[in-house]
């Protein structure tokens, strides 16, 4: 019966049932966290009235063990950047340290690559996986900013302007020593990553969504392997970042 199904999913500020299929802690716009129990499938979570009107494009759901792994990888990255900065010294070392400080200030989680939009979850069975174990969900309202990160003179939040392309955001900052100047990486709030051409000879009109991260990475280094895979590591941490 419908009443039985509804009763199986309980929102509370207290403890949750030990018999729950999935237990989820929900963080909403810096409000007190909610505890959800008894969610058998993703649709049981995202269709709750308490979450109506949420901006699902920027929502992040994570699983406990995946979070442990993501946090461990993030610490490895921070250590690598610290070592590389010490080895390089000078302007390059200072620039690397600025990137490390940005990453050190953020928290990462074991983001699950699933669709969270309630309509899409309900319509297709493959979008409605079972929930088993412990999860965390971050969801809120659409932000009015994007974030610049990486080898830029002024990292952090910038006002989002509809129709404004990536190249225009980058024109408002300087790039630090060792920065890639032909491409930048756009990380949309959905977690999708796009390598965007931004030099005068290859630039393309690409508009970020609100809540996006625009990352200016390290240029390729022909004569050393010290930077191999570094941008990929940083982008991985940025895609697993807990929303502000």
Model-predicted segments: where are they?
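Ser/Thr/Pro/Gly-biased, low-complexity, turn-/loop-rich segments
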Residues: 2, 19-244
């Amino acid at each position: 019966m419908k009443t039985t199904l509804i009763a199986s999913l309980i929102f509370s500020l207290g403890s949750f049932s030990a018999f729950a299929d999935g237990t989820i802690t929900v963080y909403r716009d810096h409000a007190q966290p909610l505890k959800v129990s008894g969610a058998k499938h993703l649709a049981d979570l995202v269709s709750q009235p308490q979450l109506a009107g949420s901006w699902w494009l920027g929502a992040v759901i994570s699983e406990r063990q995946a979070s442990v792994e993501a946090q461990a990888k993030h610490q490895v990255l921070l250590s690598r950047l610290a070592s590389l900065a010490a080895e390089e010294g000078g302007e390059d070392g200072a620039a690397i340290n600025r990137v490390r400080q940005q990453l050190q200030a953020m928290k990462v989680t074991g983001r699950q690559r699933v669709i969270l939009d309630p309509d899409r979850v309900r319509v297709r069975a493959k979008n409605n996986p079972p929930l088993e174990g412990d999860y965390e969900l971050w969801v809120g309202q659409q932000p009015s900013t994007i974030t610049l990160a990486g080898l830029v003179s002024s990292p952090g939040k910038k006002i989002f302007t509809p129709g404004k392309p990536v190249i225009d955001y980058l024109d408002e900052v300087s790039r630090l020593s060792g920065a890639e100047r032909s491409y930048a990486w756009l990380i949309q709030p959905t977690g999708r990553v796009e390598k965007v051409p931004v030099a005068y000879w290859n630039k393309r009109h690409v508009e970020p969504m609100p809540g996006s991260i625009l990352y200016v990475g390290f240029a390729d280094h022909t004569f050393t392997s010290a930077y191999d895979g570094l941008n990929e590591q940083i982008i991985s941490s940025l895609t697993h970042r807990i929303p502000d």
